[in-house]
């Protein structure tokens, strides 16, 4: 995933299983399984007997992705409030909160670190639902929503700083056991991400 984010291949680019396996020193099977996971959300497609093709995005694609993401993550938020107080989840959430506060205070110089923190934040929330498919879905979401060629570099500091603040609103609502506020904060955050994604498509 980090390679995709860093190299930023354009839509229509071909991805070779063998070439990727050699690059990362893993088996063709491992690469194929990863690519199949991305294909399930329409990020790439396989040509018969040929290479994988990186797909472009449309507003309809963005809408469908938003709807599925909202369904999964709102379910996860509800499940969080059933987690016993002595479970490791709460320690993880407190550590995430501190990391967000630290990043917010240094956002001007560390804004590029947001995508990794964002992935861990949403993975931690989704893990509460105990659904193995949601974990795989989060991998695909991470690549798509932080795929730099689709995101304008303009105001990246402000955009990431705003997302950090939205995360903190979700975390704080969870910690004070306010399910309604947590759900509302999550829905606002997902809507922000959706609108930013739509705006990036319209700039192309």
Task: Outline where the language-model segments fall.
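Short linear motifs at protein or domain termini
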Residues: 1-82, 199-204
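Short, flexible turn/loop "capping" segments at secondary-structure junctions
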Residues: 13, 46, 118, 162-164
